[in-house]
Amino acid sequence: IRLQGNSYCVQYSFSQDRDVSHTLALFMERVYKHDAEFAEFFNKMAVCKKQCCMKDVAYLQSPSQRCKAKFMNLEESVNWAYKMLQLHHKLTTLEKEVFSFLPAYASFIDEMQDIVSCVHFIEKEMKYNGLSKSTIAKCRMHINATIMCGNERMKRVGASFLSYLSEEDGLLKNTEIVNNSSDLIETTFGIFKYIQSPNKLNGVTTLLLHLPLILSFAGK
């Protein structure tokens, strides 16, 4: 479906605005997916979570990590690590022992916190106010003031973000404001699919024609 949609856009000269969340996640994945430090940190977080089960420190355990769309769901895990690092000096001796891996990754945690905070800023700006030359300008300023001042990995991510914004800017008219988020479609379809069948393996192709119907009654 996605490939066919792209072909139609090219065939009929329609401009196609990429979904902001998926696009930013893709850029992060290109930089961090095969990065040794990234893999080590999240592996240790997963091991620590298993060790916390049924112990007195279980209330401090990290959030569950997503296997699919991992780079679209980093914020919760990164925020947990950042907060735990800030409070590490207040932990008990046992708690410090269980989460002893965190201080060793302090620099990396700060790096990831800056990345996900920047992504959060861009997503909020775009989803609340739409994609426009004004919101693009605000996002550019934020990227240049934050992750472009970081290390080599952060600058690679930031450069990809800036390139993406420049490409989207070139498709916009001066006063044009467009939607570049598929959240509404995904939520509507996800709710309908769950109601139709809680089985996650249930095929979705036969349900596609029902979408116009549910959308037509959405506001009634």
Where in the sequence are the language-model features?
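Acidic/histidine-rich catalytic cores and adjacent linkers
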Residues: 2-11, 18-220
